[in-house]
Every structure is written in C-alpha cells, then in structure tokens.
Amino acid sequence: MTYCVGIRLNAGLVFLSDSRTNAGMDQIGTFRKMMVYEKAGDRFMVMLSAGNLSISQSVREILQVEKLDNGDGEPITMWNAKSMFDAVRVLGSAVRRVYGQDGQSLKAAGIDFNCSMIFGGQIKGEAMRMFLVYSAGNFIEATRETCFFQVGESKYGKPILDRVLTPRTPLDEAAKCALVSMDSTLKSNLSVGLPLDLLVYEAGSLQSSQIVCIDEQNPYFQMIHNTWGQRLREVFESIDDPRWDGSSSTHPLMSPLQRHEPVRKITHPGERIV
C-alpha cells in the first residue's frame, strides 16, 4: 500500500509520498510514488499515485504521450495544455486508456482496476489547482473548504491535517504538518514505509527547488518522530483521569443526563431491553 498527501494553500502547494509497495509479506519493495513535470517558466505539475503499481506505472508512461482531440486545433497534451483542468483531463484519458488495455484481463485474473492520483500544479497565466483522480479517470478539485487530498492509507494521518490546515497556513508549517501526518501513518501501518519524497512549491514560481528525499537517518524527520510522540504523551498525561466515585471534579464524568440513560443490564433470561 502507500500514503500520499497533497495540500493546496494560498502560498503554494505541498506534496508528500512514501515509497513502499506491498504485494505480500515476502514481496515488499521500494517504488517512488511522486512524479514531477516541470517546464521552467511555463508549467509545473506533480502527480502522486496509489493503488495497483502496474496500473500506476502504465498511466505514467501513457501520460507522457497521451493526446486529447481538440477539434481543428492541435491535440491537447500535458505539455501544451492551457489550463490545469485540461492537463488533468489528459491524465484521466490516460487512466481510461490503461483500463481499456488491461481492465478485462485484470478482471479475469480476479484483480480490481485500482488506482488513484493526486495531480496538482500551475500553468502560466492560471492560478494553482489540485485534483484527485479516481480509477475511472474522473476527478474532483480541491477548494478553499477542502485544501488537501490523500490517497492510500489515509485514515491514520488525517486528524492532524483536519485540525491544523487552512488555506492561510504557511508553506513550512504545512510541510511540517504533512510530515507529522506521515509519521502517524508509519507508526500504525506497516504497508507504508520510508524513504519519503517531500516537495514544496511557491505560488507563481513555475518551478521548484524545494524537494528532498527523507530516509531513516534524516535529522529533521527523526526530530519530528521523537518530538511528536513525546509531546502527545505529555499532553495525554496532563489530562485528568475520569472519576467514578462522583467526587468533586472540574470536569465530572458522572454528570446528570438530560435525555439519555446509561445502558441497562440484563439480569435474568426473561428480561428484555425494550
């Protein structure tokens, strides 16, 4: 499995992905999930992929040459698209092309056609945009109300993103938040693993030099891992324990209920709850 997160902010974009592929306990490999497409000064795009590795790799290859009919005009590719919307349409077409080639064979082998992508960036003359692409090639776009997307093992790392991120979050703070999200996922799920790829894009730059590969020896990620775990324990220990004896407390547990009653006990075979 994998875990990837993409964040769209007023200040720019943040992308983070792991690199573990799990096809069974004896078949764990390292494959990069991040692809960066850059034509400096004209366009900058990033794709993060999750799901079946063979499908994702096929989509990557076809995306480079995929063309959309444009009537009497030049066919649309990811390299000449005038908008990120057109670029993600090209990606969706590449996904559907792979399905047309391999979908029935995979189904006959009992394998689901499973892939999902986060695709974001900026094309000259347009604002930054970010999309979540599904297995059918359809997609949705990030908004001010939903400024991040996740693919893969998303549940472990989502709470910190929900609590911290807003469109006004600074880029470095968002990158830190993404790394905490990844650390939480690594702690709870063996199918996600190092090394990680982290990329930060500043709005309007149409290029990025802030890209790093993070392994087990990375000092900053080690600090994130140790500090986050320690501070969580400190906060947990600072919270009052529940009191069951009804004694005085600032935050009593055994408080009177306005509408509901505690769960009833069944004390003999003939008793019914209702």
Regions found by a protein language model. Give the residues of each.
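Solvent-exposed alpha-helices and their adjacent loops that cap or buttress functional pockets
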Residues: 1, 7-8, 27-28, 37-41, ...
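A hydrophobic, small-residue-rich beta->alpha segment in the mid-to-C-terminal subdomain
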Residues: 177, 199-238
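Short acidic-glycine loop/turn motifs at beta-strand connectors
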Residues: 9-12, 40-41, 122-126, 134-136, ...
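Short beta-strand scaffold segments in enzyme catalytic cores
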Residues: 2-8, 13-16, 115-122, 131, ...
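Active-site/pore-lining binding-face segments in mid-to-C-terminal subdomains
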Residues: 171-203
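Active-site periphery "cap/insert" segments of enzyme catalytic domains
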Residues: 90-131
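Conserved mixed alpha/beta catalytic, RNA-binding, or beta-rich assembly cores of soluble enzyme
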Residues: 128-166, 172, 177-180
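Conserved short S/T/G-enriched processing/targeting/catalytic segments and their helical context
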Residues: 4-104, 151-169, 223-274
